[in-house]
Amino acid sequence: MASYGFPLTASSLVDWTSLTFSPIEVNGHIQCTYSPEVAEWGAPHFVKDPYLRVHGLAPALNYGQQIFEGMKAFRTPTGSIRLFRPKMNAVRFAHSASFVAIPPVPEALFLRAVHLAVGLNSEFVPPYDSRGSALYIRPIAFASSATANLAPADHFTFCVFVMPVAPLSTGAGQGLRALVVEDVDRAAPKGTGSAKVGGNYAPIVTTMQRAKADGYGLTLHLDSATHTMVDEFSASGFIGVRVDAGKTTMVVPDSPTILRSITVDSMCRIAESFGWQVQRRAVSFTELAELSEAFAVGTAFILTPVRAITRPCTHTCIEYTADYRSSASAYTRLLETLQGIQQGWLDDAWGWTEEVQDPSSDEFITDTVQARR
């Protein structure tokens, strides 16, 4: 069994001060296949080539039969590497698979693949002192059979890719401006909104680009049935905080058409530990004017403050004047607690983190054949 010197220290070949959210070359990824002959997912393979060889008529490419996840690994003060609530990602991955006829990846295999992907790329986990940076983990699964017919696929592929990243956006200090999307709905009332499938994201890219050109860093979706209730941002969840007479209340939209965000759930638990009231319920757009602070929340965005929310059709602009830099702000308290738990400088009272296992203790297959380009 090979020894990998796990965990390796952060690579000196990476400029850790200049990370973005764009991929850089790492050692490889984990890949598993599902075939009808055995009717189960096969053993993990470590593949050094980031490219996949996929038939052009694969249902994933033609009909969108694919799912994905987003999670992170962090380096702690002692040098160990931690995952944050990975079992919740495994559960959500299976939930997404159920929407698009992909065989669910068993939780044990999902976690094993994630541990291997991180462990075999441990030198790409950012150093502990690069606060906010992490090793981003992207599990994907897709139908890889060759068929032109809209029919059940029989071959599937499951992969786990990794890359070191900085926060996607911090909106530090003043926060980001958000635009309410009015020309396209994110998800139908009985659609796939609660699943991480590409079809929930690709249709909004053009709108996001236009919004960015107009100075908006976020796009916010209302419910598709009435366009009166808050759902979520295009790529992150929504959280609002209201302070009345010294009493702090966190408000979180609750709808079957939004993604069950692991970061949002964590923020709710942290808020409750502060003694704040947490309300998961339907949130009307008009209620946003009553909030003291608002955030975009997710694995990539972490916790990003919102400065203003604009809705063109009603000529409404709701502004938030909170000093997000203040140590007393809800934003600062929530963010520092979450990052402290993730990176090991605060006690993990909830048992959310999981130390990455040494890949030397696992038996997996290393593929040396590269994909065709």
Swiss-Prot record:
This protein's UniProt keywords: Aminotransferase, Pyridoxal phosphate, Transferase, Virulence
GO MF annotations, alphabetized: branched-chain-amino-acid transaminase activity
Residue numbers bearing the N6-(pyridoxal phosphate)lysine modification: K196
Enzyme class at the top of the EC tree: transferase
Listed InterPro entries: Aminotrans_IV (IPR001544), Aminotransferase-like (IPR036038), B_amino_transII (IPR005786), BCAT-like_C (IPR043132), BCAT-like_N (IPR043131)
EC nos: 2.6.1.-
UniProt key word Transferase: yes
Domain of life: Eukaryota
Cofactors: pyridoxal 5'-phosphate
Positions contributing to pyridoxal 5'-phosphate binding: R92, E232
Pathway noted in the entry: Mycotoxin biosynthesis
Keyword Cell division among record annotations: no
A biological-process GO annotation: branched-chain amino acid metabolic process
Family: Belongs to the class-IV pyridoxal-phosphate-dependent aminotransferase family.
More about this protein: Gene clusters encoding host-selective toxins (HSTs) are localized on conditionally dispensable chromosomes (CDCs), also called supernumerary chromosomes, where they are present in multiple copies. The CDCs are not essential for saprophytic growth but controls host-selective pathogenicity.
Biological role: Transaminase; part of the gene clusters that mediate the biosynthesis of AM-toxins, host-selective toxins (HSTs) causing Alternaria blotch on apple, a worldwide distributed disease. AM-toxins are cyclic depsipeptides containing the 3 residues 2-hydroxy-isovaleric acid (2-HIV), dehydroalanine, L-alanine which are common for all 3 AM-toxins I to III. The fourth precursor is L-alpha-amino-methoxyphenyl-valeric acid (L-Amv) for AM-toxin I, L-alpha-amino-phenyl-valeric acid (L-Apv) for AM-toxin II, and L-alpha-amino-hydroxyphenyl-valeric acid (L-Ahv) for AM-toxin III.
Protein name according to UniProt: Transaminase AMT5-2
Species in which this protein is naturally found: Alternaria alternata
